[in-house]
């Protein structure tokens, strides 16, 4: 079974399971992940719509289980995917910022998960890479020969363990605030 059919089958199963149990956070996460994967096979407009739907499913999963770190991480991926497809720099930066926020929450929930740390690190660099990519693309579309250099990544200095405790506590407090905001938004 190819990748498209595989994720389409997961999406359909999740949709059916949702009808039976709309409070199943694991199922909502699977549904969001499947939509995110399926978005890669769409044109840009349909892909953005599918990513928005994935974001909605993942937010619902987090509302049900705020400590579901894998759903939080996947939500960061969804915002990253959305930002990459957004040519408007301001809108892209907003979505990259949300991705960074959710990756940070995932790191706070699972500090030993290296994938989460790497995602957070990449999300920090993503806005610069996005801007460089779209500027280079614009130059090539306009027939320009000049290419823009991608800025070199910042050197990350080691932090003291006491600082890390405050950072983790900050992310936990921020996570509570984000969950409260999402809950409030869903109620309206």
From Swiss-Prot:
Residues 183-188 are mitochondrial intermembrane. It is a single-pass membrane protein. Barely detected in roots. Disruption phenotype: No visible phenotype. The chain crosses the membrane at residues 165-182. It is found in: Mitochondrion outer membrane. Keywords: Membrane, Mitochondrion, Mitochondrion outer membrane, Protein transport, Transmembrane, Transmembrane helix, Transport. There are four genes (TOM20-1, TOM20-2, TOM20-3 and TOM20-4) which encode mitochondrial import receptor subunits TOM20, but TOM20-1 is the only one that has not been directly identified in isolated mitochondria from cv. Columbia. Central component of the receptor complex responsible for the recognition and translocation of cytosolically synthesized mitochondrial preproteins. Together with TOM22 functions as the transit peptide receptor at the surface of the mitochondrion outer membrane and facilitates the movement of preproteins into the translocation pore. Belongs to the Tom20 family. This is Mitochondrial import receptor subunit TOM20-1. It comes from Arabidopsis thaliana (Mouse-ear cress). The gene is TOM20-1.
């Amino acid at each position: 079974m190819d990748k498209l059919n595989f994720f389409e089958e997961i999406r359909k199963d999740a949709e059916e399971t949702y009808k039976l149990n709309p409070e199943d956070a694991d199922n909502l996460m699977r549904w969001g992940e499947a939509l995110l994967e399926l978005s890669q096979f769409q044109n840009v407009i349909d892909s953005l719509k599918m990513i928005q739907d994935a974001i909605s499913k993942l937010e619902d999963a987090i509302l049900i289980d705020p400590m579901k770190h894998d759903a939080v991480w996947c939500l960061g991926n969804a915002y990253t995917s959305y930002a990459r497809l957004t040519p408007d720099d301001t809108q892209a930066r907003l979505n990259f910022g949300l991705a960074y926020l959710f990756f940070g929450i995932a790191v706070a929930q699972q500090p030993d998960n290296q994938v989460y740390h790497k995602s957070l690190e990449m999300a920090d660099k993503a806005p610069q890479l996005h801007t460089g990519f779209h500027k280079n693309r614009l130059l090539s579309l306009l027939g320009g020969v000049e290419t823009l250099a991608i800025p070199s990544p910042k050197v990350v200095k080691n932090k003291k363990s006491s600082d890390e405790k405050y950072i983790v506590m900050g992310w936990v407090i921020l996570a509570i605030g984000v969950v409260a905001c999402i809950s409030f938004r869903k109620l309206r």
